[in-house]
Amino acid sequence: MSEETTKERKRPRQRTRASKNGEAFKKLRVIVLCHEDLVPPDTIEGLSAKEVAPFKTEWDVISTLKKMGHEVSPVGVYNNLGVIGNALIEQKPHIAFNLLEEFHGYPLYDQHVVSYLELMKQPYTGCNPRGLTICRDKALAKMVLAYHRIHIPAFAVFHMNRKVKRSKRLKFPLLVKSISEEG
């Protein structure tokens, strides 16, 4: 990093104010990363619950952070990390609140957004890239849990386009799930 870049990344000291219990807390600059279609409007006044439903989580997070006195900027992301990079440069956030569940339409790519935040040395909320990778692979997650003697239901992995032979240790009723899809 050049000297000029280092100077740009220095953050000014923030004002503090008292919380309800009298403790002081720091006013933070927060960027909220969310899908570009889910960036909520400035107000939901006059909108029905059905209209608010798609971006309810984003609205709740942003409005709560603002009510707590933080400076909040939503950042809509679809397939361009440059949008996040620009927000980091322009907003100089203390933290990124990560609400992204996918990148470029792929849920498996959300871990790469978090990796980018780590490369940029940007503090963020949520799980680190390794944790996201493990959690996205149900079989791997179950193997890690079993290794640590955490009880889990019996499972088996069946590969696509291959004949399925049920293991005797699997008893009916059975649930069939994709190894990498949510749900």
Model-identified regions with their sequence ranges:
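Glycine-rich, highly charged phosphate/nucleotide-binding loops
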Residues: 73-92, 107
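A structural preference for short, hydrophobic beta-strand core positions in alpha/beta folds
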Residues: 74-76, 126, 157
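Hydrophobic targeting/anchoring helices
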Residues: 2-29, 40
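A generic structural motif
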Residues: 65-73
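Active-site nucleotide/adenylate-binding loops and adjacent lid/helix of ATP-dependent enzymes
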Residues: 27-34, 89-90, 134-183
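Glycine- and acidic-residue-enriched helix-capping/strand-helix junction motifs
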Residues: 39-57
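A short, GP-enriched loop/loop-strand-helix hinge that lies immediately N-terminal to
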Residues: 43-48, 92-136, 151-154
